Amino acid sequence: MKQFSTPIRRLEGVTYWVIEDPDGIYDFINTEIRKEWEADAESEARNAEDDLWLQTLSKRRWSLEIVPIARIKLNPAIVNYVDPKSGYNFQEELAKRSLELRTGIKEFSIVIWPVIVRKEDFMLVDGYCRYTTLKALGVPKTYTYMGTI
């Protein structure tokens, strides 16, 4: 994998690590982030090879874009996910994680990555905690890695 720079950018008072080069974003998503999504599928007893989103990853072109938070849509299947066996409740865990991240951003200026959005419908596919936190902080725009077919 080629090395790409990850400069720091500030937007609306929030600091981001960003990859600006589309090839770098592609590599990052198709290696590092893909691993996370495959692990998520496995933990939910789904076959990652059957996941429609994962099947399109390598076909997507990626870009770094600034997007109004209000334009980003949430996937109800993700937001409402509950695993009755383990007791895991996505919304409850998200609320806890978002509070921690909000504190980190407000008090310590921690650096975050852009959220990942599917361009054809502006569906958020990764970064629910970052999105929720930014929305709670009243941040109107965010950096996104935008994927399009």
Predicted regions and their residues:
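A short, basic-hydrophobic beta/loop patch
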Residues: 5, 9-18, 27, 110-149
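An acidic, glycine-rich, mixed-charge low-complexity segment common to nucleic-acid enzymes
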Residues: 1-71, 81-92
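Short alpha-helix boundary/capping and kink motifs at helix termini
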Residues: 2, 64, 72-125, 132
